[in-house]
Design a protein with these regions (language model features):
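Catalytic cores of the polymerase beta-like nucleotidyltransferase superfamily
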Residues: 1-389
Length: 389
């Protein structure tokens, strides 16, 4: 019998009280917290499954003084709120009907039935909260040891139940996988067109999640070869794959964390209108759209003056453009753009009438100020006097 090692997350405030409230024999830690503990990775999200129906979970939590929120009660999920972080509690379920986008579920009482509706074997590991014994119904432990991402049961059937599992497969493969599972790859290729039926928001969420991984290049390249990427991001060509590879290397070499919007920009041609089209299609936020468009334009400016670039585009976008050009962006770490010290009143005080001429002079002096490396106010006033002399 395999046992879950002790880990820091198990000592989070409130978890012991939750186990008492639900009953240790009536709940199991499940999913990512079990998987990542076995891999000695940091655990962020804690989930548990229980035989109790949602209303019973709510009653037990309230009786124990635990704040609980019915976040997805129709699907059997409520969230217990603790200072150490929330815990999602889901009643055992089995699928009654699926249409590739959402499932109709019925509550169950069998742990294996609940495990059977999950996507991958490595995500269907259940751990007893007191004994730490692991229940593994589909060979997830062996797959975890082999770093194999494998669908539970028939891969095609799992994908037909939820088409988003195609993208989830590549995300988990990029994060955990070593060797590719032939059955999974074939199923993803054959059913790739089903991604067209998903909401744009769900596609965007998974796409950006893949982009945020330390090195998603191999996963994206396999997606491109199989035609999966062409369904959700047809703008990507081999040239863009090369750009992504270069960006990943530049981020690593210069100590920048992976950034999903920057990575997405690398997958697009260097054209702002194309980036805008993609942003609209994926329903990105306005801020994400603006940043994607700026990054996609690539470098047109001199990379020798990164601070000038940051003054024009803000730090984040300047870093994007520099890294995508393979240029040094480290100077911008923690850098804050200074405020332009010249006011219109100083120009008017020197005899220039208020109006467009003042604005023109302001722009001229500001450009010189930036090119000289943002000197102090005294130097700016000297520039002004020189310009008016």
């Amino acid at each position: 019998m395999s046992v879950l090692p002790q880990a820091g997350w198990m000592q989070r405030e409130g978890l012991a009280e939750l186990v008492v409230a639900l009953g240790a024999d009536h709940m199991r830690w499940v999913g990512g917290c079990v998987r990542d503990t076995l891999l000695a990775l940091d655990v962020h999200d804690v989930d548990c499954a229980t035989i109790h129906l949602p209303n019973e979970v709510i009653r037990r939590c309230k009786d124990a003084g635990i704040k609980v929120v019915p976040t997805g009660i129709d699907h059997g999920t409520v969230t217990a709120v603790f200072k150490g972080g929330p815990v999602e509690i889901t009643t055992l379920r089995q699928d009654v009907a699926t249409d590739g986008r959402r499932a109709t579920v019925a509550f169950a009482s069998d742990w294996k039935d609940d495990a059977a509706r999950r996507d991958f074997t490595i995500n269907a590991l259940y751990a007893h909260p007191e004994t730490s014994e692991i229940d593994d119904y589909f060979g997830g432990l062996d797959d975890l040891d082999a770093r194999t991402v494998r669908f539970i049961g028939d891969a095609r059937q799992r994908i037909k139940e939820d088409h988003l599992r195609i993208l989830r497969y590549f995300r988990f493969q990029a994060r955990f996988g070593a060797e590719w599972d032939d059955e999974a790859v074939t199923a993803c290729e054959e059913l790739s067109a089903t991604l067209k039926g998903l909401s744009r928001e769900r596609v965007a969420m998974e796409l950006l999640a893949i982009c945020a991984l330390p090195d998603p290049y191999a996963a994206f390249e396999r997606m491109r070869e199989l035609g999966v990427l062409a369904v959700i991001l047809p703008e990507t060509t081999p040239a863009q794959m090369t750009a992504l590879q270069g960006l990943i290397a530049a981020e690593a070499a210069q100590g920048f964390a992976p950034d999903p919007i920057r990575r997405l920009a690398a997958l697009l041609p260097p054209l702002a209108p194309v980036a805008e089209t993609v942003a609209v299609r994926l329903r990105l936020s306005r801020a994400q759209r603006a940043r994607l468009m700026t990054a996609a334009e690539r470098m047109g400016e001199d990379a020798e003056n990164p601070q000038a670039l940051a003054y024009k585009y803000k730090n984040e976008s300047a870093i994007d453009r520099l890294l995508m050009a393979g240029a040094d962006a480290q100077l911008l770490k923690g850098w804050e753009a200074p405020r332009f010290p010249l006011k219109g009143g100083a120009i008017v005080a020197r005899g220039v009438g208020a109006g467009p001429e003042v604005a023109r002079i302001m722009r001229e002096i500001e450009a010189r100020w930036v090119s000289e490396g943002f000197p102090d106010e005294a130097r700016v006033l000297q520039m002004l006097d020189d310009a008016l002399s």
